[in-house]
């Protein structure tokens, strides 16, 4: 799985390595969240595979919605306002945070607005990947304009 891939990369290269999926699990665990809502850009089978991955880390998904983007190109072309509106819908469920996987979906500039509208932490693939990379490099977060995770809150 993901942990074996990261370990193989680390051993082969001799440098820290990570993955977006593991970054989601690490961020959720560090922040103490147990129940999350998910808005996945993927088709349903891929969205359900992400939920199964989270379950391996004892993370409960209280609500799952998907946008049926057939490819990364389609994710990248999605209207940001549509994504925000769907995140707001997911936030109406009993979750500690909202997750938006898929690094092809350009969400980093949307995170703060999503959190403002939902009143909840929103963890996106790009944000957790950047958060993990900063930590692996020995840095710390505290960046404004990119949501609570990268803001260090």
Predicted segments, located by residue:
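Non-catalytic structural scaffold of enzyme domains
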Residues: 1-153
């Amino acid at each position: 799985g993901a942990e074996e891939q990261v370990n193989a990369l680390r051993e082969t290269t001799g440098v820290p390595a990570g993955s977006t999926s593991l970054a989601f699990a690490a961020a959720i665990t560090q922040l103490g969240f147990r129940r999350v809502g998910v808005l996945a850009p993927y088709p349903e089978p891929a969205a359900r595979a992400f939920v199964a991955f989270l379950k391996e880390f004892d993370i409960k998904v209280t609500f799952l919605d998907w946008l049926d983007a057939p490819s990364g190109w389609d994710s990248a072309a999605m209207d940001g306002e549509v994504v925000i509106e769907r995140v707001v819908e997911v936030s109406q469920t009993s979750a500690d945070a909202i997750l938006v996987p898929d690094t092809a979906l350009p969400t980093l500039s949307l995170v703060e607005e999503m959190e403002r509208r939902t009143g909840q932490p929103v963890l996106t693939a790009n944000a957790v990947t950047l958060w993990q990379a900063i930590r692996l490099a020995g840095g710390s977060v505290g960046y404004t304009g990119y949501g609570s995770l990268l803001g260090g809150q």
